[in-house]
């Protein structure tokens, strides 16, 4: 992975002041509000954000591994789009399936099962916008399986993220299988959404799908100021994991990348999402302080 030569790590320490604009000097203390959130709420919070205009970063456990859950779906869609760009796949190619292929959380494939097939681009849209699990399985098979997604990640400069299993097994912890780090995922998102991994058309399409993503509305993007556009891809396991990463475009400045991964066994999803929103407020204050 590459980093801006102006990159500097920031440790921030001040009470969380809703809606405040904090001077940059306030981000140079000895404790982090992200660590404070973790201490108060329990669990393990991983966080990484980067301002692509300045190289400034905000980090907490940014290099620790977390289960990807459905955050892998954004990268899988990027891989399929890259194959389309390279002439190895066709957007309109029909992928056939039956009712026996359906698993839980598959709204698009379930609604269209009587048709017996859906186009590749519809399956991509389904996994990004609605986290359709059956569509993810069908697309994963089409690219060559989890190992092929890992290979794609290596090809875009990500030496950390790994895909090992299909849904739903990929949502269960087993060592390092199906894990990433907040820094790795945010950096990969930067590569596919802002870099030259995809054609301009494919980058715009992926970002549009992520803007229209429904499952992440109560996470990071829920606390962004009016006018800040966000394109995100969340991930969740029922038992413990609640994740989100996003490309954020504040008006009149360079884009921001942010990734938050929260592992809290036994805590309800509503409570876990509240932790991501709280972390998101810290992110907004940090980003606002750099203006």
What feature does the model see in each segment?
Residues 102-138, 146:
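Conserved catalytic neighborhood of penicillin-recognizing serine enzymes
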Residues 44, 137-197:
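Mid-domain, small-residue-enriched loop/turn segments at the edges of structured enzyme/sensor domains
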Residues 46-50, 59, 75, 96, ...:
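Soluble periplasmic/extracytoplasmic beta-strand elements of cell-envelope proteins
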């Amino acid at each position: 992975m590459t980093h801006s030569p102006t990159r500097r790590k920031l440790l921030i320490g001040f009470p969380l002041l809703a809606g405040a604009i904090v001077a940059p000097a306030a981000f140079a203390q000895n404790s982090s509000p992200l660590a404070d959130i973790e201490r108060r709420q329990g669990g393990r919070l991983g966080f990484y954000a980067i301002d692509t205009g300045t190289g400034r970063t905000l980090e907490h456990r940014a290099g620790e591994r977390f289960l990807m859950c459905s955050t892998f779906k954004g990268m899988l869609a990027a891989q399929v789009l890259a194959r389309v760009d390279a002439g190895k796949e066709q957007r309109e190619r029909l992928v056939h399936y039956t009712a026996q292929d359906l698993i839980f959380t598959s709204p698009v494939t379930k609604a269209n099962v009587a048709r017996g097939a859906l186009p590749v681009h519809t399956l991509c849209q389904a996994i990004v916008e609605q986290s359709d699990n059956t569509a993810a399985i069908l697309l994963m098979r089409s690219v060559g399986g989890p190992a092929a997604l890992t290979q794609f990640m290596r090809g875009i400069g990500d030496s950390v993220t790994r895909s090992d299993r299909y849904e739903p097994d990929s949502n269960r912890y087993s060592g390092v299988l199906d894990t990433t780090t907040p820094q790795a995922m945010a950096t990969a998102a930067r590569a596919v959404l802002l870099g030259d991994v995809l054609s301009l058309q494919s980058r715009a399409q992926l970002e549009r799908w992520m803007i229209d993503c429904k499952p992440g509305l109560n996470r990071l993007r829920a606390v962004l100021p009016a006018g800040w556009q966000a394109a995100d891809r969340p991930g969740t396991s029922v038992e413990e994991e609640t994740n989100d990463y996003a490309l954020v475009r504040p008006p009149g400045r360079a884009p921001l990348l942010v990734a938050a991964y929260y592992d809290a066994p036994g805590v309800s999803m509503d409570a876990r999402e509240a932790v991501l929103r709280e972390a998101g407020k810290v992110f907004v204050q940090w980003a606002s302080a750099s203006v």
